[in-house]
C-alpha cells in the first residue's frame, strides 16, 4: 500500500533528432524550473571531441549545471550500461539538491534504459564467442555480421545499424548465451512502468528545415576546424575501432585523412549519414510511449511559446507546481 501512495521522483526528457535545437530549448527549460541537465549523448561524454559532437560551450550553459559532458577520454568505453549508471549517480546528486533532472540528447536507447530502468545485461558475457564474432566481422565485413543478426533476431537487426558492430555483437552474444532474442527481452523491459513521474518531450521540425539545419551544421563544423580536431585525435592514437571514433563526423573525416575520400566527398557523406541518423531517431521516438511531441513550426518557431507549452505540460503532469 505504501508503494501505491509514495510519490515518484520527477524526471524530464527533452530529445529530438540531431540539429533540431535541443540545446537552446533545454537551457530555457532548466532556467525556468531550476533543473539540471544530464547529457544523453554518446560522444559529448568524451573530452577532446567538441566540434564533431556539437558540444555545448560553457558560455551557452548560462550557469545551468551539466552532467556527463567531458568526463571520459576518447580511449574509454561508453555504452548504454555505463550511461545508465552515470546518469543514475547524477540524479542522486540532483534530487539531493532539490532540483529536477532534465535528460537532454538524441540517443533514444540510452533514454529508454534510464526512463524504464531497463535491465538489459542478463546474459553472461562470453569473451571467446565475442572474439570469434569480432574476427568474423573483420574477415567478412560488418554487413555479413549484420546478416547473421537478421537471421537470429530480425527486430534487433532493424533497430541496430550494420556499422554499429559492437551492438550487433552484443545482440548476437545475448542470443548465443540465453537462447532468447535481446529484442524480446528489451520489449518486455519496455512494458514496465517507469519508476519516475516523467514528461517526455520530443522536439521536432518539418523535414526540409531539419535537413537544411543538418547541412548547415556540418558546414559550420568544417569551418570551425573539424579536420584539425580529428587529426589531433588520430595523433593521440585514436583509431576507428574505438567507440568514440565511430561517432558521426569522426569516422567520415578519418576516411578523408586516411586517403579514402576527398574532403568534399567526406562532407557529402557526413551530411547524408546525419540525415539518415535523424530519420532513424524519429522512427525510434515514434515507437515510445507517453511522448509529448513539440512541433516547432506549430509555435511559429517562437522559443518562448515552446517553453510555455512545455511548462504547461509539466504542471499538468504534476512535475512542477
Predicted regions and their residues:
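Phosphate/pyrophosphate-binding catalytic cores of soluble transferases and nucleic-acid-acting enzymes
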Residues: 1-321
Amino acid at each position: 500500500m505504501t508503494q501505491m501512495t509514495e510519490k515518484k521522483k520527477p524526471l524530464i526528457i527533452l530529445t529530438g533528432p540531431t540539429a533540431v535545437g535541443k540545446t537552446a530549448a533545454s537551457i530555457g527549460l532548466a532556467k525556468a524550473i531550476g533543473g539540471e541537465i544530464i547529457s544523453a549523448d554518446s560522444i559529448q561524454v568524451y573530452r577532446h571531441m567538441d566540434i564533431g559532437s556539437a558540444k555545448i560551450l560553457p558560455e551557452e550553459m548560462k550557469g545551468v549545471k551539466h552532467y556527463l559532458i567531458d568526463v571520459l577520454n576518447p580511449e574509454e568505453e561508453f555504452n548504454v550500461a555505463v550511461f545508465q549508471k552515470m546518469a543514475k549517480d547524477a540524479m542522486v546528486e540532483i534530487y539531493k539538491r532539490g532540483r529536477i533532472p532534465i535528460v537532454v540528447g538524441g540517443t533514444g536507447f540510452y533514454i529508454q534504459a534510464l526512463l524504464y530502468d531497463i535491465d538489459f545485461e542478463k546474459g553472461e558475457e562470453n569473451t571467446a564467442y565475442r572474439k570469434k564474432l569480432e574476427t568474423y566481422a573483420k574477415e567478412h565485413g560488418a554487413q555479413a555480421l549484420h546478416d547473421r543478426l537478421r537471421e537470429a533476431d530480425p527486430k534487433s537487426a532493424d533497430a541496430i545499424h550494420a556499422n554499429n558492430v559492437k551492438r550487433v555483437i552484443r545482440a548476437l552474444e545475448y542470443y548465443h548465451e540465453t537462447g532468447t532474442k535481446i529484442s524480446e527481452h528489451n520489449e518486455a523491459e519496455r512494458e514496465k512502468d517507469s519508476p519516475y513521474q516523467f514528461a517526455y518531450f520530443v522536439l521536432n521540425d518539418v523535414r526540409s528545415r531539419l535537413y537544411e539545419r543538418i547541412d548547415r551544421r556540418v558546414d559550420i563544423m568544417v569551418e570551425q576546424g573539424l579536420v584539425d580536431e580529428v587529426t589531433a585525435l588520430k595523433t593521440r592514437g585514436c583509431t576507428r575501432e574505438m567507440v568514440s571514433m565511430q561517432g558521426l563526423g569522426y569516422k567520415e573525416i578519418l576516411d578523408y585523412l586516411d586517403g579514402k575520400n576527398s574532403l568534399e566527398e567526406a562532407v557529402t557523406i557526413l551530411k547524408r549519414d546525419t540525415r539518415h541518423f535523424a530519420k532513424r531517431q524519429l522512427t525510434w521516438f515514434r515507437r515510445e510511449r507517453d511522448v509529448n511531441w513539440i512541433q516547432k513550426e506549430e509555435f511559429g518557431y517562437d522559443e518562448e511559446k515552446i517553453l510555455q507549452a512545455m511548462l504547461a505540460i509539466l504542471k499538468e503532469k504534476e512535475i512542477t507546481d
